[in-house]
Amino acid sequence: MNTRTKKLPPLRVGIGGPVGSGKTTLLEMLCKAMRAHYDLVVITNDIYTKEDQRLLTVAEALPPERIMGVETGGCPHTAIREDASINLEAVDRMLRQFPEADIVFIESGGDNLAATFSPELSDLTIYVIDVAGGEKIPRKGGPGITKSDLLVVNKTDLAPYVGANLSIMEADTQRMRAHKPYVMGSVKSGKGLREVIDFITERGLLPPMPAQG
């Protein structure tokens, strides 16, 4: 199988999803799990603040200089799709500073089910929804659910507390996504995290990450 080498551009992974779905937590957990094996940098998007950058820095997901915050100043989906120039510029700046990067993670601001990443900006897209948002979320569809490369149905541990039926959610997810991959998990506790990592490395032509001891 072909693998990505330093001769290839870094893999750009877009992470999107509604506010509160767990995008930043997923990004934190990915960085902490993968940073010993891959050269990582992160770009976060917020409308008027750099709160997600701050959260990742406080959590020590990566060294502060490897986390860049972007203030979009408007609809967050515009900055990742219709006019991605502010993010493309941020990627260029980060890669000038870290030319050996293997992966650039780009986290969108909280957006809706219609948001998607521009193919100019992202090689792979991961869309995060959460069980607490309601059992009906998967069947609402939208490009994030139907067209993302990987769908993460997060916070499955909360299902008993919010009256959500995981079997129904999974069946709806399968129906809406046809044969596209998805993960049912709770990334804060680590459930499903390895599946996300394996998806990134396999689809991104990166060497597989060693199993955790």
Swiss-Prot record:
Top-rank taxon, per record: Bacteria
Location relative to the cell: Cytoplasm
A Pfam family recorded for this sequence: cobW
Sequence similarity: Belongs to the SIMIBI class G3E GTPase family. UreG subfamily.
Subunit structure: Homodimer. UreD, UreF and UreG form a complex that acts as a GTP-hydrolysis-dependent molecular chaperone, activating the urease apoprotein by helping to assemble the nickel containing metallocenter of UreC. The UreE protein probably delivers the nickel.
Name recorded for this polypeptide: Urease accessory protein UreG
Residue sites binding GTP per the record: 17-24
Gene Ontology MF, one: nickel cation binding
One GO BP annotation of this record: urea catabolic process
Protein keywords: Chaperone, Cytoplasm, GTP-binding, Nickel insertion, Nucleotide-binding
Gene3D superfamilies (alphabetical): P-loop containing nucleotide triphosphate hydrolases
Biological function: Facilitates the functional incorporation of the urease nickel metallocenter. This process requires GTP hydrolysis, probably effectuated by UreG.
Record carries keyword Zinc: no
UniProt GO cellular component terms: cytoplasm
